[in-house]
Amino acid sequence: MSFSHFDTRRFREHGFTLIELMVTVTVAGVLLAVGIPAFSKLIANNRIATQTNEFVGALNLARSEAVRRSQGVSIRSTNGSVDFASGWKIFNDPGLTGAAPAASDVLRESSGLAGKTTLKSVSRSGSSPSFTYTVSTGTSIVFNSLGGNNAGTQAFFRVCDSGDTSIKGRILQVSTVGKVSLDSATATCP
């Protein structure tokens, strides 16, 4: 009987050694410990961006409806405060008052923003590049039949994550002609 032709491949062990497995688990743990906080911040930043875009869409809808209908259209916080995070209503406002609408005048209503996002009407003071933004008394913005901001002044909104002040907020600016843009300044969130 000759063992030279004996196939030893059948008897080899397959798999990982305990040391290889421990090294792999350790490396994976380190990567997760570093990656998860950064990923959480990325998710929060994306949530702020998405919800900012949602409100920009609402402002643009109100402006375009004012032009299309040739009459005033307003957007007002649902609860009548400076806090738009709980929701807003877009409604016909031929008197250009921004006052709470009748149910029949409402064109669109939002249930608000999800999560810990805040959206407040703010006023700007100071000079560039060190503007400061403080909560204002504005509960609505009125677009006239030409699509302009009926107040004749700029309006500002601050979008923030109330759960994490390290996340940079965003400032929305509505110009006197009604154009909505993202202000280059980042909001300092309280």
Predicted segment positions?
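Alpha-helical hydrophobic helix detector
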Residues: 19-38
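N-terminal helix-rich module
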Residues: 1-10, 34-47, 53-60, 64, ...
